[in-house]
Amino acid sequence: MTQQTVLKYGVKLLIIFMCLPVHEFSHAWSAKKLGDDSQDYKGRLTLNPLAHLDPLGAIALFFTGFGWAKPVEVDSRRFKNFKRDMALTAAAGPLSNLLLALAGTILWEVALCAYWKDAGFAVSDIAQQCGSFGSAAYYQLTAGNDALFWLQFILKYFSLINIGLAVFNLIPIPPLDGSKIIMFFLSNKLNYKLYEYQMYIYIGFIVVLFTGLLDKPLGFLQGAVSSFLLLITSWVPAIMNAIL
């Protein structure tokens, strides 16, 4: 294993330790704002990674790009509207990751534009030449520039890991966030049935996840979200072209 490979793994690990706490903190913060003041003494209103780390979920995120943290325990009895507030609390985690991914995508494009201009190319061409994370044209352009390589690597994986967290947790399978969001639209009877069998459903889901059967569909969704973020930030090259 080369030194560069070790550094890549180290960077990915640091990014995971940054992203997971934000996801769970967002759940706890949202729950508190909606009336669950028990979050004050449960120790989850913090960005300390150790308070939120789930070893299995972190390992899954590291190797597959999709994972989870230790779930925030919510006292739903304190909510004014159980189904609505549970859905909002659940949505807060994936939303925080999507916002981080958006910020990372913008910064990735800013860094790329700066180098593109410095190298003597037209910044306005960046959208056509580098329309996705890790395009061949981009790596050819930055070959040999160690500082830029590591900057783009960090920003790229910062965005992709956050997208992976959001996509995975939005799957409507208990006890993932997606199941709590969709319960808002389901009958109480059906929600009770899902709650009753959620552990069996989740164990089956984890087994399927680690067999790799979900790699392609989850990868497709991750790629779709990545492309969408690049699309809605396509204004960055124009701004950078005017500034530089």
Name what the model sees in each region.
Residues M1-L244:
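Hydrophobic transmembrane alpha-helices and their immediate loop junctions
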